[in-house]
Amino acid sequence: MKIRASVRQICDKCRLIRRRGRILVICYNPRHKQRQG
């Protein structure tokens, strides 16, 4: 899980999701997991 100021989709499978006020990127590739912090 990378914690970044600006999250973005890295590949076509990445999905932007909003949970509890945080923006997350989830993907089948675990390297693409990100959270805005």
UniProtKB/Swiss-Prot annotation:
Q: What InterPro entries does the entry give?
A: Ribosomal_bL36, Ribosomal_bL36_sp
Source species taxonomy: Eukaryota, Viridiplantae, Streptophyta, Embryophyta, Tracheophyta
Choose any GO biological process term that the UniProt entry carries and state it: translation
Superkingdom as given in the UniProt entry: Eukaryota
Database matches in HAMAP family: Ribosomal_bL36 (MF_00251)
Protein's name according to its UniProt entry:
Large ribosomal subunit protein bL36c
Query: Which keywords belong to this entry?
Result: Plastid, Ribonucleoprotein, Ribosomal protein
The species this protein belongs to is: Cuscuta exaltata
PROSITE patterns tied to this protein? RIBOSOMAL_L36
Q: What broad class describes the main subcellular location of this protein?
A: plastid
Ribonucleoprotein in keyword set: yes
* Gene Ontology MF terms in the entry: structural constituent of ribosome
